[in-house]
Regions:
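N-terminal secretory signal peptides and thylakoid transit peptides that target proteins
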Residues: 2-17
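C-terminal segment of N-terminal export signals and the immediately downstream linker at the start
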Residues: 4, 22-34, 43-44
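A short, structured surface patch at a secondary-structure boundary
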Residues: 52, 58-107
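Basic- and aromatic-lined ligand-binding clefts that recognize polyanionic substrates
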Residues: 52-56, 60-64, 162-219
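Proline-aspartate-enriched helix->loop->beta-strand connector
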Residues: 109-115, 131, 241-246
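Extracytoplasmic ligand-binding site segments that recognize negatively charged/polar headgroups
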Residues: 121, 136-152, 185-208, 253-256
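Ligand-binding pocket segment of bilobal, Venus flytrap-like solute-binding proteins
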Residues: 198-201, 225-257
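Structured C-terminal subdomain patch of bacterial secreted/periplasmic proteins
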Residues: 249-324
Length: 324
């Protein structure tokens, strides 16, 4: 009798296990095998949780890294320290920031390619090789476009909650900096290429400082010299008498100077009489922004933005809560 009960129990347990397995399979089968990803060029069907992902856009790579998502191929490029692990041999070098290596892509057979910014011009060609999305970020809509990228990537891998938490953190940190940035006296944002300086106005490439954080600019788009027009020099800077000077060092960011010449650090270039004659120079309010975080990343990756916010917050607080 006992033996019959034991056998019946085993049969029931086996049936229950089969039923549970069937339920799990049915739940998995109900999941769509692909996801529609909306991006700057439209929408693309992407396989759920892709593993062979090639990322040409560094801001998207920032988001992938921050969310802990798999990456198989990256461009050969200067990387900020927190992305330096992608220079390891286990990652396929898929080209440069501007030009894909089509042979490398053919060997890798990616199930997703991500472009943006510098690589966005290759979208049409790459989309013929594999599902491709363009996560380019507009300078005047940085948070909106970052949210689109983070939300799309998190959704591909079932990490929606993590994506929402990340964007909540970014928005919170940006909001905490805005009062300090907006109260700071007007300043000038300059991109430096050795001793050549180029002013940057609101609404342009590095609009994060003015358009997102609300810092005041002494210059408008009309004040910025047109390409091929008269150069803007240190004498012009001295005439403006800015309270704040923000500097993005292009050569330090890229690790190269035009024509293969020597790199002269901006800290050395800006150590001159004209800068010292300005209120910014006299108050120690010449801010050398993180070169890679601003020039390469454009402040538009989540970690890049958080780091750049932290630097500016520290600067403004040291200057007296951003009121100088």
């Amino acid at each position: 009798m006992q033996e019959q009960i034991s056998r019946r129990s085993l049969v029931l347990q086996s049936m229950a296990a089969v039923a549970l397995a069937g339920s799990a399979w049915a739940a998995t089968a109900a999941q769509p095998s692909s996801v529609t990803v909306h991006h700057a060029k439209g929408s693309t069907e992407v396989v759920r949780a892709p593993q062979r992902v090639v990322v040409f856009d560094l801001t998207a790579l920032d988001a992938m890294h921050t969310l802990g998502l798999p990456v198989a191929g990256v461009p050969k490029a200067q990387l900020p320290d927190y992305l330096s692990s992608y220079a390891a041999p286990r990652y396929t070098v898929a080209g440069s920031l501007f030009e894909p290596d089509y042979d490398a892509l053919s060997r890798l057979r990616p199930d997703l390619i991500i472009v943006g910014g510098r690589s966005s011009a290759k979208y049409e060609l790459l989309s013929k090789l594999a599902p491709t999305v363009d996560f380019s970020v507009r300078g005047t809509h940085m948070l909106e476009d970052m949210d689109r990228t983070v939300t799309a990537l998190a959704g591909l891998y079932g990490k929606q909650a993590q994506g929402r938490a990340l964007m909540d953190q970014v928005r919170s940190e940006v909001a905490s900096l805005r009062p300090l940035a907006s109260r700071a006296a007007p300043g000038v944002l300059l991109m430096a290429i050795n001793d050549k300086i180029m002013p940057q106005a609101p609404g342009a490439r590095f609009g994060f400082l003015f358009d997102v954080l609300g810092a005041q600019s002494l210059l408008t788009a009309k004040d910025v010299p047109a390409r091929g027009g008269p150069a803007f020099g240190f004498d012009d800077l001295a005439k403006l008498q800015p309270q704040w000077i923000y500097v993005i060092d292009r050569n330090t960011a890229t690790g190269s100077a035009p024509g293969g010449g020597a790199i002269v650090p901006s800290t050395q270039v800006f150590d001159n009489a004209q800068v010292r004659s300005t209120p910014a120079g006299q108050k120690n309010q010449v801010v050398f922004l993180d070169p890679k975080g601003w020039y390469l990343m454009g402040s538009s990756g989540p970690t890049a933005m958080l780091r750049n916010v932290a630097q500016l917050k520290q600067v403004y607080q040291a200057a007296g809560q951003g009121q100088r």
